[in-house]
Amino acid sequence: MRETGIHNTAASIATSGLKEISAVFYNLGAARLYEETVRRGEAELSAQGALVARTGQHTGRSPKDKFVVRDADTEDHVWWDNNKPMSREAFELLYADFIDHAKGKELFVQDLIGGADADNKINARVITEYAWHSLFIRNLLIRPEQEALASYVPEMTIIDLPTFKADPERYGVRTETVIAVDLTRKIVLIGGTSYAGEMKKSVFTALNYILPAKGVMPMHCSANEGPNGDTAVFFGLSGTGKTTLSADPTRTLIGDDEHGWGEHGIFNFEGGCYAKTIRLSAEAEPEIYATTQRFGTVLENVVLDENRQPDFDDGSLTENTRCAYPLDFIPNASKSGKGGQPKNIIMLTADAFGVMPPIAKLTPAQAMYHFLSGYTAKVAGTEKGVTEPEATFSTCFGAPFMPRHPSEYGNLLRKLIAEHKVDCWLVNTGWTGGAYGVGKRMPIKATRALLAAALDGSLNDAEFRIDPNFGFAVPVDVPGVDTSILDPRSTWADKAAYDAQAKKLVDMFVTNFEKFESHVDHEVKDAAPAIRIAAE
C-alpha cells in the first residue's frame, strides 16, 4: 500500500480495516487535490479557478436512505420515529462489503475536526474515493495545524464510496444508496451517492447525538457577533434568510450552518461554508459571490459555458447548486469560530400565509414551542399553477439531523435561554398584506431595521401588544419601520379573510404539536396559539 502525505503512522487507515489499497493520499492540500481530481477526470476548472463537479443523479441529500444502527447503547436515546433503524448485523455486513469494495482503489484521507471548542470537538477522519470529495470536506470542516497531523487520532471515521451500490435485500435498505450511521462506534458509511453534502451532515448528526449528554446544545443555525462582543444565533429552515441575514458587514460571522452552545458560549462545528448559488449575483451577495471566483472553492452542479464561465442562473442540473469554501474566504469571518454567550436568538420563518407579524418577542416557553414546531411555509411551484402555500414543520429547525427526541434539544435550549437571560425573537421574512399570490414579500429593509433594533437592545424599550392569535408580544412602533406592517391584520384589505387564514394556520400549529404534548410541561402547552383562540 503506497502512502503519501503527513499522518500518524500508528493510526493509518488499516486501523479501520482498509487493506490491499492501491494508494492512500493523506491530508493533501488544495493544489494537490486539484491535480488528482483533474488527472482522474472527476471535475473541471472554471475560468476563475474554482473546481466544478457534477454529482449525477443525486443533487441533494437522500434522507430516506439514511439509517442509524439500533443497539443496546442507542435503543433508549435515539428518536426512532424520525430515524430509520439498521441492525448491528446488517451494518457489520455492509462494513465488510465496503472494505472489500475499496480494495485496489486509490483513497484520499482528510484528518479533520468537528467543533471549534476544544472541550467539545470530535476528531473526524474522512476517507473518500473521489479526490474532489476530499477537497470539499477539507473546505467544510476544521483543519488541524500541520504539526498536529503526525499525532492525530481519529474519534470518528466516515468512509465515502460513491461507486458502491447497496443491495436492498442484503442489507435491508431501500435503494442502491445508503448512509449508515453507527453512533456507538462512530462510523459512517456513505455509498451510492456523489452528493458531497452527505459527509458534512454525517458529522453534524454525530455531534447532535454526543453533545446533549454533556449539556451542550447542538444547533442548525447561523451565528454572528457584534462589535461589542454580543453574539446572535439565527435558526431557520431553507429559504428563510438565515445565511443572508447573518452575513452582516457590521458583525463578525461565526458560521453559517451548524453550531454548539456550551459553558463557554457559541462555537462553530465547521471551518467552512456550503452556500446555495442558484441566481447568485455580485450585487445581492458580494461576499459569497467572491468566493466562487477563486482557486480552492468547489462548485457543485453549477453549469459552465464553453468558456468555462459559471452560469449561476442555470438550474438545468438542479436548483440546489452550491459552493463549498473555507470560512477564511469571507473577509469578516471569525478566526476562532467562537463567540460568547448569546444575547439574542432569532427564529426565522417565511410565512407565506401572510398571518405572522414581521417580528415578535418570545418568552422562554414560547421559544421552546416555536423551536419544537420549526415552522416555515413553502410556495408551491408556479409551473403547476398552484398558489396555495404549503406549511412545513421541521422540528428543531433541522429534523433530518436530530438523532435524539426533539424534547431533549428543546429542554436544553429553554434551560440555556433562562440561565443566560437571552432575548428571543420570531422574525417573519415571508408575506405581508395577504398570502402569497395576493400580498407582497416582507421588505428586506424593514426586516434588517427590526433585526438591528433587536440586536442593539433598543427594541426592548418599545411598546408591545399581545398578538390575539399567537399570544406573543409584537412591537407597536419601531423607528424607521412603517407602522402598518407591524400589525399583519391591518395590512389585509379583507379582515375576515385574514381571520380565516389566521385560524387555519393556528390549527396547523396545534395539529403538528400534538406529537410533543406528552413531552412538555404546562408552560410550553400554554404557549400554543390554540389556547389564546379558545380563551376568546
Swiss-Prot record:
ATP binds at residues 201, 220, 236-244, 285, 322, 447. One of its GO terms (biological process) is gluconeogenesis. Binds 1 Mn(2+) ion per subunit. The keyword Manganese applies. Its cofactor is Mn(2+). InterPro entries: PEP_carboxykinase_ATP, PEP_carboxykinase_C, PEP_carboxykinase_N, PEPCK_ATP_CS. The gene is pckA. Involved in the gluconeogenesis. Catalyzes the conversion of oxaloacetate (OAA) to phosphoenolpyruvate (PEP) through direct phosphoryl transfer between the nucleoside triphosphate and OAA. It is an enzyme of class 4 (lyase). It catalyses: oxaloacetate + ATP = phosphoenolpyruvate + ADP + CO2. Belongs to the phosphoenolpyruvate carboxykinase (ATP) family. Mn(2+) binds at residues 201, 220, 257. Keywords: ATP-binding, Cytoplasm, Decarboxylase, Gluconeogenesis, Lyase, Manganese, Metal-binding, Nucleotide-binding. It is found in: Cytoplasm. Its EC number is 4.1.1.49. This is Phosphoenolpyruvate carboxykinase (ATP). It comes from the Bacteria. Pfam families: PEPCK_ATP.
